[in-house]
């Protein structure tokens, strides 16, 4: 039986689910950019891409060389194809305008070019996260400048989302709103090949991911919930849990999509004015779309993440996502 490449899968989606051709082409371009980023990541010190740039992004985070390179790869790959009206990146202050010499398309691309970049220098998994939205009609004119407001749509408006994870294998995990598929990069073929069909998250789990070093800063509902997880069989939840933490959302969520679990990045008392650390547009929305399509759930502790109306490109949010049973429990504790 012949293997199903990403291109073939997207063509079949065009036939069976009326996926627009422009969206298919856009996903293929993003996938090609991810292959290029994967190649750069795999070269490591041999490619001269390790270390920091000595600059900070809009988040106040020190930019790694690969952060900047990955951002440039995604911009250059996608700006000329005629599929996009604009782009927004975690590494850039403002929305990216499609140069006037190129045609505009009907979609907006939002991305974190290299999630978990603190892992680069220790050779641990990193990844690229992306989200696709439809551009509002008023911005589709060639003469209309694109501004931030075009992107400020709730996660329910996403038409596609996914991530590439650069680990022992490079994988692309994708949803077009009809379930979640996983594609592994065959380096000999140069193609992403469908290897994981109908990825599904179990409703219950015995695994969770959280940065325990921040425990003293958590709010009371999170303190209570995690203490119950750690209490194991002797505690109120009556079962033992294992904790995992890779310090890259893309890696932790990939594990949860693969075998179940709960990912938590709650707000804490160090910056009470901020509702969380992770970015709604670049990280929480695309990952929540994937998790829900795989049968899981995602909230900020109070409401469904995909229902949140963004107020800014770089808005932050608390995140609880993964197996439905545990997400529901953590959310219920916040409401008591």
Curated annotation (Swiss-Prot):
This protein's pathway: Carbohydrate biosynthesis; gluconeogenesis
Q: Which InterPro entries match?
A: FBPase_C_dom (IPR044015), FBPase_class-1 (IPR000146), FBPase_N (IPR033391), FBPtase (IPR028343)
> Which controlled-vocabulary keywords does the entry list?
Carbohydrate metabolism, Cytoplasm, Hydrolase, Magnesium, Metal-binding
Q: Which family is it part of? A: Belongs to the FBPase class 1 family.
Pfam families tied to this protein: FBPase (PF00316), FBPase_C (PF18913)
Q: Which GO terms describe its cellular component?
A: cytosol
Source superkingdom: Bacteria
Provide the residue positions that the database annotates as binding substrate.
115-118, 211, 277
What Enzyme Commission number does this protein have? 3.1.3.11
Main localization category: cytoplasm
What is the taxonomic lineage of the source species? Bacteria, Pseudomonadati, Pseudomonadota, Gammaproteobacteria, Pseudomonadales
Localization per record: Cytoplasm
| Catalytic activity annotation | beta-D-fructose 1,6-bisphosphate + H2O = beta-D-fructose 6-phosphate + phosphate
Q: What is this protein called?
A: Fructose-1,6-bisphosphatase class 1
């Amino acid at each position: 039986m012949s293997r199903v490449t990403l291109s073939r899968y997207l063509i079949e989606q065009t036939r069976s689910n009326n996926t627009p051709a422009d969206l298919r082409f856009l996903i293929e371009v993003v996938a090609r950019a991810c292959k290029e980023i994967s190649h750069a990541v795999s070269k490591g010190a041999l490619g001269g891409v390790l270390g920091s740039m000595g600059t900070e992004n809009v988040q106040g985070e020190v930019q790694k060389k690969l952060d900047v390179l990955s951002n440039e790869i995604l911009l250059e790959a996608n700006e000329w194809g005629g599929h996009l009206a604009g782009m927004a990146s975690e590494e850039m202050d403002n929305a990216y305008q499609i140069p006037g010499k190129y045609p505009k398309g009907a979609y907006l691309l939002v991305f974190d070019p290299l999630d978990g970049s603190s892992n680069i220098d220790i050779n641990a998994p990193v990844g690229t996260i992306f989200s696709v939205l439809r551009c509002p009609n008023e911005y589709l004119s060639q003469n209309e400048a694109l501004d931030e407001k075009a992107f400020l749509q709730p996660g329910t408006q996403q038409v596609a989302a996914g991530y590439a994870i650069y680990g022992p294998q490079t994988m692309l995990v994708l949803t077009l709103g009809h379930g979640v598929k996983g594609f592994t990069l065959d380096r000999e073929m140069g193609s992403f090949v469908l290897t994981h069909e109908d990825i599904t998250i179990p409703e219950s789990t015995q695994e969770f991911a959280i940065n325990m070093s921040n425990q003293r800063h958590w709010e009371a509902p999170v303190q209570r919930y995690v203490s119950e997880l750690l209490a194991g069989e002797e505690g109120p939840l009556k079962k033992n849990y294992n904790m995992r933490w890779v310090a890259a959302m893309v890696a932790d969520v990939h594990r949860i999509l693969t075998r179940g679990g709960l990912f938590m990045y709650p707000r804490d008392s160090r910056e009470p004015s901020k509702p969380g650390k992770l970015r709604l547009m670049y990280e929480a929305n695309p990952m929540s779309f994937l998790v829900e399509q795989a049968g899981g759930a995602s909230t900020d502790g109070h409401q469904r993440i995909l229902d949140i109306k963004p107020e800014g490109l770089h808005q932050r949010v608390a995140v609880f996502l993964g197996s439905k049973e545990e997400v529901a429990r953590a959310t219920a504790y916040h409401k008591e």
